[in-house]
Amino acid sequence: MTQKTQLPNIYQNFKGGILHPFSPGIGKMTLSPELIAYLLKGMEASTEDFGQNLAGVIKSQPAFLENTGQRVMKEVGKFVLDFAGAGVISASVGIYAMDFKTMESVCVDGWFVDQKEKEYNPMHSHINCQMSSVGYLEVPKQIAEPEDKWDSHGCIEFSYGTPTTMVCTGVMFRPKVGDFYVFPSWLNHTVYPFKGEGHRKAFSMNFSIREKNDQS
């Protein structure tokens, strides 16, 4: 099916002011203590290695257990759908909106990341999905509370666009237990290594948006 250009509608909608239609969004919410505890137990129990599917230079990346994705979706599913809906509105400058009654977010796959000293994730993006995410379960003190607030050790950085004036092409977040980020699957991101003891424990999930099953 050929999609008609949005140009005429955008032109008519934009009456004046300042327009920022190009930047991809990043969503953030806070996970419940109960879900964090559940995921930490699942991380310890998982014996399947998911690392062979990933770009990370990280030894321990266990796969989700059978029901883990469903449990997480009970808490984050609506937020993921809201994030997708906000993207539709932003990309179309308010012309189009998602019909939340007929659509749902689904987990494509998920895995844990048990990062240790000197391990890292190179710049990469995700495939076979529409959105990706990361949630933090345990963070070493030297990452959470660094002596130098500009220290990037253990941080995640997202990168997009061509470096030039008046444009932000990179944004960095310091991991905090309970923080959960959602972003477009094609958005490049990297995780920096850190020094010292401790484990930087996190999980990642990929999502897609689809029409609801009539029986759901």
Locations of regions flagged by a protein language model:
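C-terminal "cap" of GNAT-fold acetyltransferases
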Residues: 201-203
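Non-heme Fe(II)/2-oxoglutarate
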Residues: 2-100, 111, 118-121
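Catalytic core of non-heme Fe(II) oxygenases with the double-stranded beta-helix
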Residues: 105-182, 190-192, 199, 209, ...
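Aromatic-acidic/polar surface patches that form glycan- and anion
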Residues: 69, 73, 126, 196
